[in-house]
Amino acid sequence: MLELDEKKIRKGKPIGLPYQGSKKKISKKIVEIIKQNFGTEKPVYDIFGGGGAITAECMLNGLEVHYNDLDETVTSMFQKVVSEDRDYLKTLIVSRDEFLKIREKENKTIDDELKLIVNSFGNNRKNYLYSEEFSDLKYNIAIDVVKNHNTFKGYLKTKTYIDAVNNIKDKETLKQLGRIQQLAYIQQLERLQNININNLEITNHDYTHFSYLSDAIIYLDPPYEKAHLRGYSINNFDSKAFYDWAYKMSKKNIVLISSYEISDSRFKCVYEFKTVKSTFAPNKKSGDKTEKLFMVKKGEE
């Protein structure tokens, strides 16, 4: 099993796009595991990079990292957020009506995709954050908080939010008000703007493109078996071929795979994140599954 001294984990919140399937909850631990067990000299290849949580954490820890994802949209969103300023982030909060119009567009811009992420339930880019009954109320509060207080955080203590709460007489409406999730997602994007990506190599290749690698740390977060991921799908992602490739790559590299379980007996669990369970599960039972790291068994390399 790999070691992790949690006292050495970077202080502060994890960063990355608010992206479905993101490793943000465990990105700090994963990168610290890499540092403590394999050092800081080898380059890290984040080949299924998704929302960039592992890549960003590597950068904050001073590791050389290569950010790749087959879905060019997600890497473009990452670059867009980092390259823009705080005022740009304010434009990403949209109403339910605007969200639905954007969703139905055939050709979406990167701005459109970011608006869908920030304003969708579970960042799925399909369903608006709030029910139709309460969407206007919560959207208007979000806009007013940003306009009146120029803040994305601490909004629960702003006069705008407090006044809105005090003006609500209906108990059910008050109960539904809760958090203004758009502001929480914008906070995540704002933290992402603190990194410098001038020297970051970003690509959009299939994982097999990296077959040339040697003496590198290859971090893999592939579509989990019986699951679905943007860019790949359950119909065209061959898990067996992927495991064969990862096994082959482990002969000249350090290969780490994130998953709940791996059916290939050549791999074993080397670390389990016992407090992090599945949020978007491919089936009902997988809600009890925990995130794990896998490597090729010793003697199998």
Predicted regions and their residues:
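S-adenosyl-L-methionine
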Residues: 1-45, 49, 53-54, 60
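Long, positively charged, glycine-interspersed low-complexity recognition regions
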Residues: 5-7, 225-226, 231-301
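Conserved proline-anchored active-site loop of SAM-dependent methyltransferases
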Residues: 30, 44-58, 67-71, 114-128, ...
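Short amphipathic alpha-helical segments and helix-helix/interface helices
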Residues: 31, 35, 55, 239-247
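Short active-site oxyanion
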Residues: 40-44, 63-64, 196-200, 251-255
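Short loop/helix-cap segments at secondary-structure boundaries that form the rim of catalytic
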Residues: 58-60, 210-214, 261-270
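Class I S-adenosyl-L-methionine-dependent methyltransferase module
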Residues: 61-198
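Acidic, His/Gly-enriched loop-helix segments that form or flank divalent-metal centers
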Residues: 154-156, 162-220, 224-250
